[in-house]
Amino acid sequence: MAQHPIATLNEELVPRLPPSSPTLFEAKKKKNLSFEAIAKHVGRDEVAIAALFYGQAMASAQDIKKLSEILDIDAGMLESQLSGFPNRGSTLDMPPKDPTIYRLYEIVQNYGQAYKAVLHEKFGDGIMSAISFSTKIEKETDDKGEWAKITLRGKWLPYSRF
């Protein structure tokens, strides 16, 4: 199985990120740890950990303790940097410029109306929550190559009549 390099921080993003992001990414790079390895230690999903690194998720006291342990970062400094509410959605231009992120945007452009129609047929008038939500990424391999499998799981929230 081929080992791929770990994800590091794109310096162009730094002005849009909280102070914790460079701290976390520098320690991740120094230790040569994947998000998967960090997530296993913390006890969370790797996408949740990556979101935390980019300032898009809130860290619990337990998350901070575990991150401090695995990354050898002072817990007090990490707690100070990770306190407060995340400024979600602040890292992206729309439409996105990065090809990987643009493909996700393109999926919504191409299939968004179809997703909406099928969701409404299955659940009724409402929306899928991105708050009561989880996601995961899996790698599948078959005779045609490697495939990315992204699962989105959100609670269905029916619109209220008033």
UniProtKB/Swiss-Prot annotation:
Provide the active-site residues from the annotation: R103, E106, S129
Recorded hits in SUPFAM superfamilies, A to Z, give: Cyanase C-terminal domain, lambda repressor-like DNA-binding domains
Picking any one GO biological process from the record gives: cyanate metabolic process
Q: Does the keyword Endoplasmic reticulum apply?
A: no
The answer to whether the entry has keyword Lyase is: yes
Pfam families for this protein: Cyanate_lyase (PF02560)
Q: Which reaction does it catalyse?
A: cyanate + hydrogencarbonate + 3 H(+) = NH4(+) + 2 CO2
Concerning its family, UniProt says: Belongs to the cyanase family.
Q: Which PANTHER family match?
A: CYANATE HYDRATASE (PTHR34186:SF2)
Task: Please give the name of this protein.
Answer: Cyanate hydratase
* Gene coding for it: cyn1
